[in-house]
Amino acid sequence: MTRLTGLRRPLLPIAGAKQAPEQAIDGPQVEVPLTAVDRRRVRRRLHAPDGAELQLAFPTGTVLSPGTVLGTRGGVSYVVSAAPEDVAVVVPRTLAEAAHTAHAVGNLHRDFVEDAGAFLTPWDAPIELLLTRLGVPFTRETRPFHGRPSWEHEG
């Protein structure tokens, strides 16, 4: 019999990843556009659109969601926004087609995120091939993506 006591990690994933602490925004703000991949890189330096250099040092595992305050300098708050990136925009014709497509995309360990009546997933060659084989209507667009990057899979 296998013993499951003393595990360092929980056996089942905990709902939701660590989120950066919420801070009140007071005064002017500068949006710092970050892609889904960049929003997972929480220990680094980056340059804001106004030229300010920000040094990030959030705890490992933190997810920088849009609206997270990265820091404040001289009364200006630097806030995360979702940068436009290459995505497949899928518009299934039926609920059954949506479920079948979501299942197939999930088998490739990709997020399938609802956005304004369509579904988005990061664009790459395997996704293009899959969607073409399924015969589901899709287009390639540049839009903000709020899911996880294609290489990250929970479980």
Curated annotation (Swiss-Prot):
A GO cellular component annotation in the UniProt record: cytoplasm
Task: Name the keywords, alphabetized.
Answer: Chaperone, Cytoplasm, Nickel, Nickel insertion
Where does the record place it?
Cytoplasm
Classification via InterPro entries = UreE (IPR012406), UreE_N (IPR004029), UreE_N_sf (IPR036118)
Output the Gene Ontology terms for molecular function.
Answer: nickel cation binding; unfolded protein binding
Recorded superkingdom: Bacteria
In the record, biological process GO terms are: protein folding
Matching NCBIfam families: PRK13261.2-2 (NF009756)
Its biological purpose: Involved in urease metallocenter assembly. Binds nickel. Probably functions as a nickel donor during metallocenter assembly.
Which family would the database say this protein is a member of? Belongs to the UreE family.
The protein depicted here goes by the name Urease accessory protein UreE
| Name of the encoding gene | ureE
